[in-house]
UniProtKB/Swiss-Prot annotation:
GO CC terms: cytosol; cytosolic large ribosomal subunit; nucleolus
Family: Belongs to the universal ribosomal protein uL11 family.
Ribosomal protein as UniProt keyword: yes
Database matches in SUPFAM superfamilies: Ribosomal L11/L12e N-terminal domain, Ribosomal protein L11, C-terminal domain
GO biological process, one term: translation
Record-given protein name: Large ribosomal subunit protein uL11A
Name of the gene encoding the protein in the UniProt record: rpl1201
Organism: Schizosaccharomyces pombe (strain 972 / ATCC 24843)
UniProt keyword annotations, A-Z: Cytoplasm, Methylation, Nucleus, Ribonucleoprotein, Ribosomal protein, RNA-binding
GO MF annotation list: large ribosomal subunit rRNA binding; structural constituent of ribosome
């Protein structure tokens, strides 16, 4: 006999989804089917919650309590950097492995670092900014027209001041 259903129990599920697209029922069913939820309905909720992240892969946090699913987006550093590039949404099925050759201002990088501060292991905001600069390098964009590695060196040498918080 299966265990009794506890209405106060909260289950949390993290999964990757493409922003603005309805996740396939086949990928959701094994995770949320046993919890008594409709995979199709949860897929539509995920698509609604991620419409701001169209075409980008983001982590979605499903909080399930009393057979109700609450969807929240947990963006990755790369998704935030790509969003800061303000590139138009592209067709995911046609374009694969696209290099993002745009330019991001240092202020936007600092904003992304503030958003990602809770995930960072750095002691100060400048360390988090350097983490995000590393992500910007791997995404392939420039920061204020310079290579992100050069900006990191300038922060280390004290040429660029990063606010404390």
């Amino acid at each position: 006999m299966p265990p009794k259903f506890d209405p106060n129990e909260v289950k949390t599920i993290f999964m990757r989804a493409v922003g603005g697209e309805v996740a396939g029922g086949s990928t959701l069913a094994p995770k949320i089917g046993p919890l008594g939820l409709s995979p199709k309905k949860v897929g539509e909720d995920i698509a609604k919650a991620t419409k701001d992240w169209k075409g980008l892969r983001v982590t979605v946090k499903l909080t399930i309590q009393n057979r109700q699913a609450a969807v929240s987006v947990v963006p990755s550093a790369s998704a935030l950097v790509i969003k800061a590039l303000k590139e138009p949404a592209r067709d995911r099925k046609k374009d694969k492995n696209v290099a993002h050759s745009g330019n991001v201002s240092l202020d936007e990088i600092i904003e992304v670092a503030r958003t990602m501060r809770f995930k960072s292991l750095a002691k100060e905001l400048s360390g988090t900014v350097k983490e995000i600069l590393g992500t910007a390098f791997s995404v392939g964009c420039t920061v204020d027209g310079k290579n992100p590695h050069d900006v990191q060196k300038e922060i280390d040498n004290g040429e660029i001041e990063i606010p404390q918080e």
